[in-house]
Amino acid sequence: RSVVSGRSIIITTTNGTRTMHACVSAKRMFIGSFLNLGALIRVLNQTNNHVAFVCSGREGQFCTEDALFAGACVNILCRAENEFCLTDSAKTSRLLFQEHHQRVFESIQNSDHGHYLASIGLESDLEFCSRVDLVDVVPVMIGDRISLCDTF
């Protein structure tokens, strides 16, 4: 926090930026990954609104790591006493996660995008990004601004 607190930060990604622009009219958009899974779930459990998981994909296409993460979120949320009406994509993501939950890194590593990232020397990034609950923060986008969520 000390590095970024009070500063404007400009970020661009190939897929995440497009997703954020597409969701700019949403009331708020929480940003999550395996790295902040537990923190994101705590925030979502406090939200009384409809929740939609928007996966960025890769170059406009489905990617395994997004589906695994969405499935992890759906799986955890469904274990609570909440009732959810799941879409087919939510059900499928959940099944994918349930099948691969003990080998997330290997599943991502063996995906098309995982092979690509390894081919350009970024396999260590895959391993890092498959870690669970490494950070206890949740970025939230409201309008065109991203800040840290202070809900939890």
Placement of each model-derived feature along the sequence:
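Glycine-rich phosphate/diphosphate-binding loops that line cofactor/substrate pockets in enzymes
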Residues: 43-51
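Short, structured patches in soluble enzyme cores that scaffold and shape functional sites
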Residues: 11-15, 33, 53-57
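Long, charged alpha-helical interface segments
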Residues: 1-14, 22-28, 48, 64-152
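Active-site-proximal helix/loop microenvironment
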Residues: 53, 59-66
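Short, acidic/small-residue loops that bind anionic groups at enzyme active sites
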Residues: 30-42, 80-85
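Internal active-site segments that recognize and position negatively charged phosphoryl groups
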Residues: 18, 22-23, 38-44
